[in-house]
Amino acid sequence: MEIPPQEAPPGPGADADADAEAEEAPAEAGSSSGASPPTDGRLKAAAKRVTFPSDEDIVSGAVEPKDPWRHAQNVTVDEVISAYRQACQKLNCRQIPKLLRQLQEFTDLEQRINCLDLKGEKLDYKTCEALEEVFKRLQFKVVDLEQTNLDEDGASALFDMIEYYESATHLNISFNKHIGTRGWQAAAHMMRKTSCLQYLDARNTPLLDHSAPFVARALRIRSSLAVLHLENASLSGRPLMLLATALKMNMNLQELYLADNKLNGLQDSAQLGNLLKFNCSLQILDLRNNHVLDSGLAYICEGLKEQRKGLVTLVLWNNQLTHTGMAFLGMALPHTQSLETLNLGHNPIGNEGVRNLKNGLISNRSVLRLGLASTKLTCEGAVAVAEFIAESPRLLRLDLRENEIKTGGLMALSLALKVNHSLLRLDLDREPKKEPVKSFIETQKALLAEIQNGCKRNFVLVREREEKQQLQPSASMPEITITAPQPLEESGDLPAMGAQNGTPGPGPGPDSDSDSDSDREEQEEEEEDQSDQQRDEGGTDQSSSAPCPALLPSTDSLGPGDKSPPGSPSSPTEQRISVSSPGRGHKVFVVTRVESPPERPEPPVPPTSVSSPPPSPPSPPASPPSQTMDTQDPESSEAQPQTEPSQAGQPLPNGLKPEFALALAPEAPPGLEAKGSSCSLEHALHRSHGVSKLEELLLEASQEAPRDTL
């Protein structure tokens, strides 16, 4: 028997020898072309290479995501109905007559339609699949799926459609007891992904232990829901713990309705108390018809103390609360500043409970509505309530129905209403309570009528107060007063000083430009010239060439180069608008009539000295100027100055040819200064009686015209 030769183990230098052999191997392979691979089967290290494609070759193609609204563009009612019927035929399911009737009534398909009502219709999986043809084309504000007998498959299909097409902002899935875990999982996905969903009504739809984690996760991470109804959803225990823990981090939910869930006074109430400690965005918490008890109310009151700005409405109707729980609530009320509605109806509070609550209500100052219906109150408790009414300046409504409040309690309430001026509604039983003395029944009726009258009186006072507040201008709004136009004097003259500073009297005001006598004489001369011109023209051109109204600020608010000359003509029909604003002083605006706003105001031009006979006494104009300043249209006022060139072909009232008027100042802007000088020239020309005088005036006018038109 031959023994195979044994190889000696590699020595310390074996690794170095192996490396040397590996380096020599490529040289040997290059020398012998037909060399076989090495006997040990090892691959060469230099033969391993990795290559990557270029950037252009990495992406072979791209697919755009499907547009969910590709079917909803320019859709018609007939198209929607036809698509729905074809889907029903394809799926071999019945058509819903109620849906077809609603589709035929829809008119505006561009906007969200008010409501899609499928309440009471039995919806199986195939029927829900056919509804996709409607949801892919139309959007709704409310989708009502109440009591539609949804199963897991149908519910998950519908919720996926509503999430994908954003079909509703308000969704009602109440009274569907068989949607199961997959249905709630799809509903949670819809709540998390749909940004438009704001209202979810899941009353009488059980949310059990294995379904609650999905909903809790959706509410904790991201949800746009503002209103959540979970009445009679079997939340007691672990579902409520998961829900309350998730809502601690939710800042969007504002209304939470948890009625009829058999919530107990220990674990469940402790979770609600912790929720109120951390969540300050919740505004309405409805806990009616549960078993909170006094022990649970203690936990809730601990959370209420932290609600300085948050909870607005707390409903504790029918929770077996007694006077012991009212002591906890009375200590918590002074700490909350946001609670406005507190409903404690149908709890055996009794007179002692109202006394425990009274001091807290008086110290609270935020409660506006208080419900104490059917709380075992008698006249003694009504007296305590009356003390609170007398001390409350904000209480709006109080419910005391279904209590044994007789004559004594009604008298206390009536006296409190004489002091209170805020209570608008006090609910009491209409029928008087039985009394041993028959006359007391009539007294109760009289007291009830007196209480009603007191509430009506407060209502009238509140309305009057609101109207006064609306009429009072705010501090940031300027007060605008319009002064009536001054009556015309017999001479038809109005001082130009009053026209500029808005003062009714002829004396100089604090904002007048000049107090010198020469200015007054110039103003009187200008006014006489204007009245003479009106007499010559006979008022025939006043209506046709009436200038547009303008608001001219007072001269004290203008710059040194913007002041108009003191001799500018003033209209007797002007209106003065006085504007005062806090911190901005007092300004006066004068409503007058001008041809058009001047392009560049000029300094006052002294009137040319023209020798003319003394003017005749002014006569009143043929027709007084009509006050059309408030009724003129801006378009008509802009079109009026354009009618003046059409009058160039008519003879002028002073007997001059129209060509002379055009040659006198062809490029003159219609400013106030040019008007004043032209009026004085026309007056002088009209009063001259000789040809020589007329020639002198024409010569002077031709010399003065270029200077006036600068």
UniProtKB/Swiss-Prot annotation:
Pfam family, one: LRR_6
SUPFAM superfamilies assigned: RNI-like (SSF52047)
Ranges of Low complexity composition bias in the record: 27-38, 543-565, 656-676
Pro residues compositional bias, start-end: 1-12, 603-624
LRR repeats (start-end): 224-244, 252-273, 281-301, 310-330, 338-358
GO-annotated molecular function: protein phosphatase inhibitor activity
Positions carrying Phosphoserine: S54, S60, S581
Amino acid composition bias (Polar residues), ranges on this chain: 637-649
Record keywords: Leucine-rich repeat, Phosphoprotein, Protein phosphatase inhibitor, Repeat
Start and end residues of each stretch annotated as Disordered: 1-46, 487-677
Domain of life: Eukaryota
Skewed-composition ranges (Acidic residues): 16-26, 512-531
UniProt record similarity statement: Belongs to the PPP1R37 family.
Known function: Inhibits phosphatase activity of protein phosphatase 1 (PP1) complexes.
Subunit structure: Interacts with PPP1CA.
This protein's name: Protein phosphatase 1 regulatory subunit 37
Organism this protein belongs to: Rattus norvegicus (Rat)
Gene designation: Ppp1r37
